[in-house]
Amino acid sequence: MQILNKILPQVEFAIPRPSFNSLSRNKLVKKILSVFNLKQRFPQKNFGCTVNINKIRDNVIDKIKDSNSGNQLFCWMSQERTTYVSSMINRSIDEMAIHNGVVLTSDNKKNIFAAIEKKFPDIKLDEKSAQTSISHTALNEIASSGLRAKILKRYSSDMDLFNTQMKDLTNLVSSSVYDKIFNESTKVLQIEISAEVLKAVYRQSNTN
């Protein structure tokens, strides 16, 4: 909640809908948390076995450095920052459609990307970005370390739950890797992104 309290006062909601504009900051925080289930996005959860996130993160970073030596690493960082943040935006848009049945128009999607670029002018965005190099490397590390096999053994009777656990673990590791490499908080980024998606939803619903 401390991060939310720091970020939300900076968010301006210029939306012609009284019920939304009149929301207090605490109510707005609860709204964002409920719509995007942010409490679960950064979980302290049990994966059915011992998981050392920091160790996996460091191994992923080592593999990334090994694959991108010298000046290649700086090129990789520039491209990956674009891809990673863009994929976060696309994932939030997709989750709004899946969990809340709201499909944003192409113009509203573009507005979200434009708003995030305005808030973070040093980050170039790409609307077409999907899977990131960090996530791919994290998934491979989870498999090669034997963690995937352990989680599969624990949840073999429920493959949907297994897939959810793997997705959550991959996202958790990926966020930790991004935070350390770029010295930025994915939690802060996610809250800013979620706020912009929520504003787009209200704008769209107000025009329909």
From Swiss-Prot:
Pfam families: IpaB_EvcA (PF03278)
Keywords: Plasmid, Virulence
Protein's name in the database: Protein IpgB
